[in-house]
Amino acid sequence: MWGRLLLWPLVLGFSLSGGTQTPSVYDESGSTGGGDDSTPSILPAPRGYPGQVCANDSDTLELPDSSRALLLGWVPTRLVPALYGLVLVVGLPANGLALWVLATQAPRLPSTMLLMNLAAADLLLALALPPRIAYHLRGQRWPFGEAACRLATAALYGHMYGSVLLLAAVSLDRYLALVHPLRARALRGRRLALGLCMAAWLMAAALALPLTLQRQTFRLARSDRVLCHDALPLDAQASHWQPAFTCLALLGCFLPLLAMLLCYGATLHTLAASGRRYGHALRLTAVVLASAVAFFVPSNLLLLLHYSDPSPSAWGNLYGAYVPSLALSTLNSCVDPFIYYYVSAEFRDKVRAGLFQRSPGDTVASKASAEGGSRGMGTHSSLLQ
């Protein structure tokens, strides 16, 4: 069921490409801005809905009827804010609690540093969503101004791709610990963990920076709506947005996912060759890898399809499918805490001890149970911490 849910934006995108395609000539009254009836030049397929700047008002964009219908439909105004709301309701407390426990209860290990940064990235992603939820629920009306729009866009993408990069760092740490345990004693130090965290944050910041350099708020023609990032002028696509989002998809998603595939592939092979006593760790590693691929590949594949053909009508309104697929990608921040932290009996015991101020003597039984489970699967919690 989850697989179908995550793949439906791709199906929607291909159905849009065969049906309501973006026309190369706007047939709406005044949409070409003035008396020039010539066909607009073919530009690269746009990141957002293709907007034509009105000749007498540079703050207003005219959209084709097909794009306008998708922009104002139930998917962006109801489904997308519902998905973002789920991330906020589940991801905020789950990641906040996990970060608190990791910072106050967990041992100061290099792997703990990586998991703390992952929890922080997922937490910041959830905190970046309320303005976008308000925007979509208000029927695509952005009330916060241009600067806030740029910051909200950069925060959404920066923290999401920062999470992907940190997931890759965690996979490398797990690879060293399980595939090269002897070498890991020398390599898996605080210096390596700190370097991986700094590299992930700096890369995420560099990828998000171009999202703050171009104007992103425009008024929708024949309405009172001010759009944030959802409709952008065609002439800005090839020069700015195409390279910016191509780099985001390739460097922020597919390259880290490739690293995760290689690291977790080797980890799975090592666990499988070790015997049945690693069965739980084997299944958990497979779930971690599958969730990352399932949540991030559809939206980033749609993003690259935008720029795979020079004609704006080649793929139709793929952006209409990209918006919900992006919202689905943010759901990964809700899943991370449960497959990286709360799956561990030892971590759950630390949560209970922290919440209810239980002394170590009160948790002997639960710790003994966790240790017994660890012996049965080759250190249950060590796979995560």
UniProtKB/Swiss-Prot annotation:
It holds the Pfam family 7tm_1. It is a multi-pass membrane protein. Activated upon interaction by mucunain, a cowhage (Mucuna pruriens) plant cysteine proteinase. Residues 48-82, 130-151, 214-247, 305-319 are extracellular. Receptor for activated thrombin or trypsin coupled to G proteins that stimulate phosphoinositide hydrolysis. May play a role in platelets activation. This is Proteinase-activated receptor 4. One of its GO terms (cellular component) is plasma membrane. It is found in: Cell membrane. Keywords: Blood coagulation, Cell membrane, Disulfide bond, G-protein coupled receptor, Glycoprotein, Hemostasis, Membrane, Receptor, Signal, Transducer, Transmembrane, Transmembrane helix. Glycans are attached at N56. PANTHER family: G-PROTEIN COUPLED RECEPTOR, PROTEINASE-ACTIVATED RECEPTOR 4. Disulfide bonds join C149-C228. Widely expressed, with highest levels in lung, pancreas, thyroid, testis and small intestine. Not expressed in brain, kidney, spinal cord and peripheral blood leukocytes. Also detected in platelets. Residues 21-42, 362-385 are annotated as: Disordered. It comes from the Eukaryota. Residues 104-108, 173-192, 269-283, 344-385 are cytoplasmic. Gene3D superfamilies: Rhodopsin 7-helix transmembrane proteins. InterPro entries: GPCR_Rhodpsn, GPCR_Rhodpsn_7TM, Prot_act_rcpt_4, Protea_act_rcpt.
